[in-house]
Swiss-Prot record:
GO terms for cellular component: cytoplasm. It catalyses: 7-phospho-2-dehydro-3-deoxy-D-arabino-heptonate = 3-dehydroquinate + phosphate. This is 3-dehydroquinate synthase. InterPro entries: Dehydroquinate_synthase, DHQ_synth_AroB, DHQ_synth_fam, DHQS/DOIS_N, DHQS_C. It comes from Ectopseudomonas mendocina (strain ymp). Pathway: Metabolic intermediate biosynthesis; chorismate biosynthesis; chorismate from D-erythrose 4-phosphate and phosphoenolpyruvate: step 2/7. The gene is aroB. Keywords: Amino-acid biosynthesis, Aromatic amino acid biosynthesis, Cobalt, Cytoplasm, Lyase, Metal-binding, NAD, Nucleotide-binding, Zinc.
Length: 367
């Protein structure tokens, strides 16, 4: 087992990474202050891992809340089901909420913990690659709004993150690829040597090789922990973690939450960010194509939805959380391994990026 730490003073917490960790009761119990635990999971994960987790929580007063699965349910109505479960079980301020599932479960359970009786402890137990390398670390919690993704939420740090890599054995290939979008992101924004490792090991990652997956998770979490420790509330460098997300969130919102997986939308958005960085003269054609090819090798879409117009992108991007004083800030690449957050770009470059022929770009890789 590998243990990393997110350093936030008195709110610092560990990230445990290894196989079989769901069956190690001491990893959970050391972070549960009271006797009450509320496990929040979904209909897909519950049959696979809920009983294993409950066995590790023997001796505690445990309530379970099983939610419908999918991004389409990341909303107020589903959030209320968590509060209903906590109140029905008479859970008090010393309860600990445990999020067992992917990013949707982690975001909603964390937000519920932040709100319930003005804040109770919670633990992240992510079961998808995307949640293991990204959403479970850093304290971002929340729900979607019909007008924008993740627009309602709070920064609220967990007491611990427990990553059982064995849970990836049951992850569908599409979900695995979606998680790889966030793994690739770390190489693009802050760790160029990692890109070379990913290129050499992509086949192993996609075939669920445990050693390769564990290494990728550890390296991704280490990068995320370092950034969060330096900028917890996204006032500076943490915003670079959103490479591809401004374009990607527009895709998710316009297409309907859950039609594109988050990682799929981020992948297409990352291609657009690479294209814009190239148009600004910051990265070469070869560097752009290297990033796009790696996303393609991960089994991810590299073409935005063909039915989305530039106007539709701009409409959704206008309510992005990185908009400040009416200016749309974007995460772009100065080079592979170095990202910036900037609103200092010619509008015509953004317009050209939105009009680019990504189908032709994709076809050029297959010719």
């Amino acid at each position: 087992m590998q243990t990393l730490h997110v350093e936030l003073g008195e709110r610092s917490y560990p990230i445990y990474i290894g196989s079989g960790l769901l069956s190690r009761p001491e990893l959970l119990s050391r972070h549960v202050a009271g006797r009450q635990v509320a496990v929040v999971t979904n209909e897909t994960v519950a049959p696979l891992y809920l009983q294993t987790l409950l066995k590790s929580l023997e001796g505690f007063n445990v309530a379970t809340v099983v939610l419908p699965d999918g991004e389409a349910f990341k909303n107020w109505e589903t959030l209320q089901l968590i509060f209903d479960g906590l109140l029905t079980a008479r859970h008090d301020r010393r309860t600990t909420v445990v999020a067992l599932g992917g990013g949707v479960i982690g975001d909603m359970a964390g937000f519920a913990a932040a709100c319930y009786q003005r804040g109770v402890d919670f633990i992240q137990v992510p079961t998808t690659l995307l949640s293991q390398v990204d959403s479970s670390v850093g304290g971002k919690t929340g729900i979607n709004h019909p007008l924008g993704k993740n627009m309602v939420g709070a920064f609220y740090q967990p007491k611990a993150v427990l990553i059982d890599t064995a849970s990836l054995d049951t992850l569908p290939a599409r979900e695995l690829s979606a998680g790889l979008a966030e793994v690739i992101k770390y190489g693009l924004i802050c760790d160029e040597p990692f890109l070379g490792w990913l290129e050499a090991n992509m086949a192993a990652l996609r075939s669920l090789d445990q050693d390769a997956l564990t290494y990728a998770i550890e390296r991704s979490c280490a990068a995320k922990a370092q950034v969060v420790g330096a900028d917890e509330r996204e006032s500076g460098v943490r915003a670079t973690l959103n490479l591809g997300h401004t374009f990607g969130h527009a895709i998710e919102t316009e297409q309907g939450y859950g039609v594109w997986l988050h990682g799929e939308a981020v992948a297409a958005g990352t291609v657009m960010a690479l294209e814009m960085s190239h148009r600004l003269g910051w990265i070469s054609v070869a560097e752009r194509d290297r990033g796009v090819r790696l996303l393609q090798a991960a089994g991810l879409p590299i073409v935005p939805p063909r039915d989305m117009t530039p106007a539709q992108f701009l409409e959704h991007m206008a309510v992005d959380k990185k908009v400040l004083d009416g200016q749309l800030r974007l995460v772009l690449l100065k080079r592979l391994g170095e990202a910036v957050v900037t609103a200092d770009y010619p509008r015509e470059i953004l317009d050209a990026t939105l009009r680019s022929d990504y189908v032709a770009l994709a076809q050029s890789f297959n010719s």
